Amino acid sequence: MKLAVQHFSHSSEIDIRVWESLENRIFYHQANFSDAEGYSVLKAYLEQLDQQYGTQGNRLFYLSTPPDYFQEIIRNLNRHQLFYHEQGAQQPWSRLIIEKPFGVNLETARELQQCIDANIDEESVYRIDHYLGKETVQNILTIRFANTLFESCWNSQYIDHVQISVSESIGIGSRGNFFEKSGMLRDMVQNHLTQLLCLLTMEPPSEFFSEEIKKEKIKILKKILPIREEDAVRGQYGEGIVQDVSVLGYREEENVDPNSSVETYVALKLFIDNPRWKGVPFYLQAGKRLPKRTTDIAVIFKKSSYNLFNAENCPLCPLENDLLIIRIQPDEGVALQFNCKVPGTNKLVRPVKMDFRYDSYFNTVTPEAYERLLCDCILGDRTLFTSNEEVLASWELFSPLLEKWSQVRPIFPNYMAGSLRPQEADELLSRDGKAWRPY
């Protein structure tokens, strides 16, 4: 375990004294999820450790398990009194972390929530989305609401469109069984990309607290218009070359149906029906086996309307759209592109870029997303965790599209591993006179 910590830690080295104090408090207990007796033994073992080390009975249960076991584990933890239902300032606490997926559609999400409601208090549930633990994602609200430069033009009057892109060069690896039940829309879009969209578009909360932020995100989710089938593209990679390595197509991967209709790429065009965003298209894309690993948000502003820079007055001034790029991974940071005069006697205008990177500006190591989120859970801070209302509102948006897709068998594969995306995804934007930004 020490070697693993050394390998994955962002810190340059581990303080051996700190590690030894932690190592002596790590214990392993094995049981079967379905074995009722195992939970009784676990309860007795935890109580023994409480007495031995004076840990006062605090419990954090992290269900990093196959989602099929969530409800069974939750019921058994409650049945064997491993959850506390009366938690005050001077009393021990019990908390539950659940990994996505939170259901596979609206119906199953409601079933999971019914199980949660019957067994543990909602305030003790932490639905983890590791994207919300990334430093740049947390910075979105600060960029927006702490800077008049951006918030004053953060609306349909000045913004042409927005692109949110998640590109992964990897395939599904050994996750074939899981991915066959999920697909890219459930695995990435319904949660990660939707959370980014909410933070990018929500109204300012009355206070910078967990519940107020969640209220504004839910309002946005409920204002997203139903997704039209013609505004959604799905794809699946075939064999190809990624970073000079030949790779299999999705249907040839381990534990994948050779005739699978599961999507490994999704592109969507969404609209938000409120005064701030009316008419602004939001383009979302996420895919596997693309050329490189990157996640970013691009806010594309409208071109200047001043006649000073039209073709007649300034033929050498082909203005580009101003851009705000929020890089989530790799190289977390923010870049601003704007038009500037080229030095010299001619009236030449070219786009230039100002680029901020966390690792070069701040003399500190950015913690891993999970590191921040686990710490918040221990402290009882739910700000960066997803609420049940957000989960259900998101499924209300995407479940109808998934149902439509299930009724029509797609022609797959429709993009090569290592290529940019399916042709249909390019056409989704070209119909609007736009194009995807480079990864």
UniProtKB/Swiss-Prot annotation:
EC category: oxidoreductase
Amino acids binding substrate: H130, K134, E168, D187, K288
Example GO biological process: glucose metabolic process
EC number: 1.1.1.49
Key word Cell division present: no
One MF term in the entry's GO annotations: NADP binding
InterPro entries: G6P_DH, G6P_DH_AS, G6P_DH_C, G6P_DH_NAD-bd, NAD(P)-bd_dom_sf
Reactions mediated catalytically: D-glucose 6-phosphate + NADP(+) = 6-phospho-D-glucono-1,5-lactone + NADPH + H(+)
Pathway: Carbohydrate degradation; pentose phosphate pathway; D-ribulose 5-phosphate from D-glucose 6-phosphate (oxidative stage): step 1/3
Alphabetic keyword roster: Carbohydrate metabolism, Glucose metabolism, NADP, Oxidoreductase
Coiled coil stretches, renumbered: none
Gene Ontology cellular component list: cytosol
Family: Belongs to the glucose-6-phosphate dehydrogenase family.
HAMAP family: G6PD (MF_00966)
NCBIfam families: zwf
Protein name: Glucose-6-phosphate 1-dehydrogenase
